[in-house]
């Protein structure tokens, strides 16, 4: 399959749907998208899309997987291409030998996993397509630790509803990149914290040492440079309160299912 497939950005699709098929597809920078009433329409469309997606797809349904011959020769490194902090640079310099992933929040037994331990755990390999909201896509091969194993090891609370991923890259003063998913996606068999890409160690530009792969959602949900995983029952307490950097800063959909 070619990696040149173009997908319609979901915000434009939802805008068109919310306007009753009038054919009016507005760019994200259009002044109308700043109107509170219009934003409410978009949020309603997002909720409808999420509900339809859950109804149509079984909670365990897999995203399409591909063959080795489908792997894209070029996989664009989008967004940050470095963690951007002195602490992260030090981890890169010593090849993450002293780095560890923290699992905490609403868990019974908070855990720390170093990279060697993560690589020694049961892993999953998958060749999947990364679909960017900008309209490009690429196919890559990923191997990593299933997120559900880490949450189970930490004893996830029955009161937890969301999993938040705290990342090393900074997108402004006091604004590190972060993302979140619900428990359906957190426990999905294809949701992994990837430490390998295309049979090699995950490159820095693609999010080393760990990158979230949540294969049934758009690219901005695939958080890079994951440093900490936190279980919570409420997303409103984090930064702008919408569950992710792009959601907070640019009103992207929190649920980006495809």
Model-derived features with residue positions:
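Short, well-ordered coil loops that connect the C-terminus of an alpha-helix to the N-terminus
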Residues: 19, 109, 156-157
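Generic hydrophobic alpha-helical segments
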Residues: 20-24, 139, 154, 219
């Amino acid at each position: 399959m070619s990696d040149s497939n173009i997908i319609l950005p979901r915000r434009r699709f939802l805008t068109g749907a919310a306007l009753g098929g009038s054919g009016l597809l507005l760019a994200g920078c259009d002044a109308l998208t700043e109107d509170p009433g219009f934003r409410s329409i978009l949020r309603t469309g997002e909720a409808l899309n999420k509900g339809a997606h859950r109804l149509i797809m079984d909670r365990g349904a897999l995203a399409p997987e591909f063959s080795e011959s489908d792997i894209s020769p070029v996989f664009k490194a989008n967004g940050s291409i470095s963690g951007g902090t002195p602490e992260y640079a030090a981890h890169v310099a010593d090849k993450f030998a002293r780095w560890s992933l923290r699992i905490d929040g609403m868990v019974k037994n908070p855990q720390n996993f170093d990279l060697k331990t993560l690589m020694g755990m049961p892993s999953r390999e998958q060749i999947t397509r990364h679909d960017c909201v900008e309209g490009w896509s690429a196919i890559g091969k990923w191997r990593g630790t299933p997120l559900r194993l880490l949450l189970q090891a930490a004893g996830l609370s029955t009161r937890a509803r969301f999993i938040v991923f705290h990342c090393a890259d900074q997108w402004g003063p006091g604004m590190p990149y972060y993302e979140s998913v619900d428990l359906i996606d957190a426990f999905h068999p294809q949701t992994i914290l990837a430490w390998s890409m295309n049979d090699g160690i995950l490159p820095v530009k693609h999010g080393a040492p760990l990158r979230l792969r949540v294969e049934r959602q758009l690219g901005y949900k695939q958080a890079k440079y994951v440093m900490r995983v936190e279980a919570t029952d409420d997303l409103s307490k984090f930064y702008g309160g919408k569950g992710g950097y792009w959601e907070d800063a640019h009103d992207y959909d929190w649920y980006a299912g495809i």
